Amino acid sequence: MLPRGSRVRTRQEHALVGRSGRRVRAGSIVVHSVQTDVDGPPRAGFVVGRRVGNAVVRNRVRRRLREQTRSRLSSLPPGTAVLIRALPDAAGSSSADLGRSLDSAFRTVRSPRPQRSARSG
């Protein structure tokens, strides 16, 4: 279980991160991230929809994601909020696969966004 201060808990927080955040797909997960308050610890929330499987499968995927995230959350900058959404393929993924996907996504989240060039036209 993640500590209380390290969780995205409310519906408003989930909506903020999901709608206005940066989105990164890695393997069988999608990670939405947004920089919130600078002083707070990094926080994580999880979304595992019905398309992933029945309740037993969804809870297993959520537990695996939570455990893999717990050890990696401190690698994110302070004040970062992430929402980790499992895709249907996550049901067949091992914990190691989910961990590799999280590593890849978190690497992208930590990197600065590339500047978009202005289009002429």
Curated annotation (Swiss-Prot):
A single GO BP: tRNA 5'-leader removal
The source's domain of life comes to Bacteria
Q: Which SUPFAM superfamilies match?
A: Ribosomal protein S5 domain 2-like
Does the record's keyword annotation contain RNA-binding? yes
Statement: the UniProt record of this protein carries the keyword Transport: no
Job description of the protein: RNaseP catalyzes the removal of the 5'-leader sequence from pre-tRNA to produce the mature 5'-terminus. It can also cleave other RNA substrates such as 4.5S RNA. The protein component plays an auxiliary but essential role in vivo by binding to the 5'-leader sequence and broadening the substrate specificity of the ribozyme.
Q: What is this protein called?
A: Ribonuclease P protein component
Organism field: Parafrankia sp. (strain EAN1pec)
> Gene name on record?
rnpA
